[in-house]
Amino acid sequence: MAHELSAGSVFAGYRIERMLGAGGMGTVYLARNPDLPRSEALKVLAAELSRDLDFRARFVREADVAAGLDHPNIVAVHQRGQFEGRLWIAMQFVDGGNAEDALRAATMTTARAVYVIGEVAKALDYAHQQGVIHRDIKPANFLLSRAAGGDERVLLSDFGIARALGDTGLTSTGSVLATLAYAAPEVLAGQGFDGRADLYSLGCALFRLLTGEAPFAAGAGAAVAVVAGHLHQPPPTVSDRVPGLSAAMDAVIATAMAKDPMRRFTSAGEFAHAAAAALYGGATDGWVPPSPAPHVISQGAVPGSPWWQHPVGSVTALATPPGHGWPPGLPPLPRRPRRYRRGVAAVAAVMVVAAAAVTAVTMTSHQPRTATPPSAAALSPTSSSTTPPQPPIVTRSRLPGLLPPLDDVKNFVGIQNLVAHEPMLQPQTPNGSINPAECWPAVGGGVPSAYDLGTVIGFYGLTIDEPPTGTAPNQVGQLIVAFRDAATAQRHLADLASIWRRCGGRTVTLFRSEWRRPVELSTSVPEVVDGITTMVLTAQGPVLRVREDHAIAAKNNVLVDVDIMTPDTSRGQQAVIGITNYILAKIPG
C-alpha cells in the first residue's frame, strides 16, 4: 500500500469513511465494519512495523491481551489482522478528540484535568489488576467522548500496540520523544519495571494537563535534557505556574513522580483521589506518601462506611467470588493469563540517542541528586530522636500491593498457565459443611467466624488457578487481613493456630451438594518454622484427589494466610513458604 487510503476504498473488508489521524505508528481511519452495522476506528500500522517479523508476533499476542480487557474506560479491541502486508487493528470508535487536543484548544481546565486523570486511573487500576501494563500513558491516548449530556466520557487507548512496540524497540523519532516526556526513570535506566511506571507517567500527564508543559521541557539536545530530568531532577511544581493551585497539588505530583517506585502511590485510584482532594480541599488528614509496595494493582475506598462495604480497585460487585482456600469450587470462567513483562522496554529506534543521554547524564553527575521536594517532605512522618519509630499500620489500600505479581506466583509453583480471579474483599461463608465445624479455618482462610470483624480494617484475598480441566486444579490462595493494631493480629494468629492444633493429625469430613459423597481430608500435625505455621491436608478418595499445603503467619497488624494445591508435594511445600515469606518481607515492621 504505497499511499494512504481514500474514502470509499476497502481495506481488509472495511470500507474507509475518512481519516481520523496519522502518526509514526500508522494511520487511523473511520471505517465501516464488514459484518456489523457500525463504524470502527481502523488503525493500519506503518509499513516499517509490519515488515518486522518479531514485531508482528508480538503485535498479535499483545492485541489479543488488549482484546481481553473489558472496562468502560478502556477502548475495546474488536479485531486484528494483516492485509496486503500491513498489520491492522479495529477498535471501538470514540466520537471526539483526546486530552492533548483539548489542551491545545485551551479547553482543558484544572477541574477537567483532574477529572480526566481520575477516569484514566480507573482504567489503569483495572488493567494492572489483570497483570497488564500500558507503557505509553500520555494525554494523546486519553480519548474524550462528545457526550450529549452528563459527565464527559474518558477512554484509554493503545494498550496492545504500545506494549508490542516497547518489546521490539521499533518506533519513529517523533514517537520516541513523545514517549520520553512521560517515561519513568526505571524504564529509561533499563531496570525492571511494573505498573508503577504507568503511575509515574500518569503524574507527568497530570502536570502537562494542568500547566500545558511537559514536566521536563526539551530544548537543544532534547533527548538528553528530558532523560536527565526524569533521572535526576526533582519533580516540578505546579503551584508557581498555575494560579489557584496549592502546594498540596505539588505534593501529589511529587509522590506520583517519585524516582523510587516504592515511594509512589499504591494505585492510580489513590493518586486520583489525592489529586481531587488537593484541588477541592477535600479531607486529606493523615495522608502521607505511601510506604514501599512491590506491586500496584488496586486502590482503597474513601473512608466513610464500614470497610467491607467498599470494594477495592475497579471491582464494584462480587456476588459470588471464588472462595479462598480448599476445597476448590466451581469458579467462574477464568480470564486469560496476564503477564507483567519485566524485561527492559527499548524506547525506540533512536533510543541509541536516549541511551547516550543516560550515559552522559550519569557520567557528569558526580553526586546524583536525591533532594526531596519540600512539599513532599513536609508530609512525611517524623520520629523522636530518643524513641525508635514504630512501624506504620498497614491500611486497607495497601493490602493488594503486598501480594507477589502473577509471574512470581507462577515461578513459585512452577506452573505457567495460571489465571487470577476477581479478589475477595470480605469474609465469605463457605459453600458446604465440615465436620468438626470449627475446622473450616484449617482448610482455608476467609471464613467470617475466624475473625473479630470489629477489629478488621482491611481484607484482600486472591485466588489463582488453572483453567478448569475436569480434575482438581493447581490453585494458589492468598489472603491478607489488616487489623487495627499488631497485638490484635497476633491474637488472631494465636487463635487460628489453636484451631489448627485441634484439627491437625486427624480426619475431617467435607460435604458439598454437587458432590456424590463426602470427602475425607487427612490433616497433618501443624509445624512452626521461623514464625510460619504450616499444615498439610490430603484427599485420596474417589470424589477428589488433591494435596493442600497451608500456611499462616502475622507481622505488624497483618495476618497472612496462603494455601497451595498441587500434586507436586515438594513444590507445594516450598511454594507456600516462599509466598508467605515474600508477603511478610513487604510488611513494614
UniProtKB/Swiss-Prot annotation:
Residues 1-342 are cytoplasmic. Residues 364-589 are extracellular. It catalyses: L-seryl-[protein] + ATP = O-phospho-L-seryl-[protein] + ADP + H(+); L-threonyl-[protein] + ATP = O-phospho-L-threonyl-[protein] + ADP + H(+). It is an enzyme of class 2 (transferase). GO terms for biological process: regulation of glycolytic process. Changing residue 179 to A: Decreases phosphorylation. The chain crosses the membrane at residues 343-363. PANTHER family: MITOGEN-ACTIVATED PROTEIN KINASE KINASE KINASE 20-RELATED (PTHR43289), SERINE_THREONINE-PROTEIN KINASE NEKL-3 (PTHR43289:SF6). In vitro, phosphorylates various substrates such as EmbR, PepE, MmaA4, Pyk, LldD and GroEL2. This is Serine/threonine-protein kinase PknJ. It comes from Mycobacterium tuberculosis (strain ATCC 25618 / H37Rv). The gene is pknJ.
